[in-house]
Amino acid sequence: DVAIDMPAGPSEVEVLADETANPIFVAADLLSQAEHGVDSQAILITTSVELQQAVKVEVERQLALLPRKEIAEKSLANSKLIVVDSMAEAIELTNAYAPEHLIIETEDYLSVAERIVNAGSVFLGSLTPESAGDYASGTNHTLPTNGYAKAYSGVSLDSFIRKITFQEIKPEGLNIIGPAIELMAANEQLDAHKNAVSVRLGQLENGNGN
């Protein structure tokens, strides 16, 4: 058996958009995720009622043209087109959802991106579709789903590297951090932890650091 960090899937995309977004692009982004599987989820969060309505119409138009229409149609049953009152609310909802893929199609997408703390992979601007991340832009598309982006990152080289830490404390260093270690150990009532430092500090005070 091989341990893994988490199950990946079902797949998700969220488009975070304002009134400047192109509904044709947004609909295409939602459908590109919906065709993955019947349990995929595609979410639009927008501050614009007009955009929401335009995207709804465009999704129906593009859906009718897809070879995987039946799959995408079932996926859309799990999906939502959400209108919020402000961009601040949209960002708060996004961070709570922690989408696997997040596409930001707003006028000030860079400043919006700075406020995103939970997402697997973020696609910036109207010309950056999620499918670019799947195939060509170089980012890994094995990403946390189902809210796990709050705690995990996507697969990277770090995922396959085993790391060992090494530390050495010199006399000056022990004199600096030793009292803090003693205080913390005493607070946890771990006297042996404290003593491991205290005996060394005592030796240093007596001029014997060995």
Residue locations for each model-derived region?
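Flexible, glycine/charged-enriched surface loops at secondary-structure junctions
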Residues: 3, 40-45, 65-75, 105-106, ...
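Gly/Ser/Thr-rich active-site loops/lids in small-molecule metabolic enzymes
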Residues: 6-12, 38-45, 49-57, 67, ...
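A glycine- and small/hydrophobic-rich beta-loop-beta segment
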Residues: 36, 44-119
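Electropositive phosphate-/nucleotide-binding environments in soluble metabolic enzymes
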Residues: 7, 20-28, 45, 49-53, ...
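C-terminal core of ALDH-fold dehydrogenases
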Residues: 95-209
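General beta-strand structural signal in soluble alpha/beta enzymes
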Residues: 4-6, 15, 26, 83-84, ...
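Conserved NAD(P)+-binding/catalytic subdomain of aldehyde/semialdehyde dehydrogenases
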Residues: 1-41
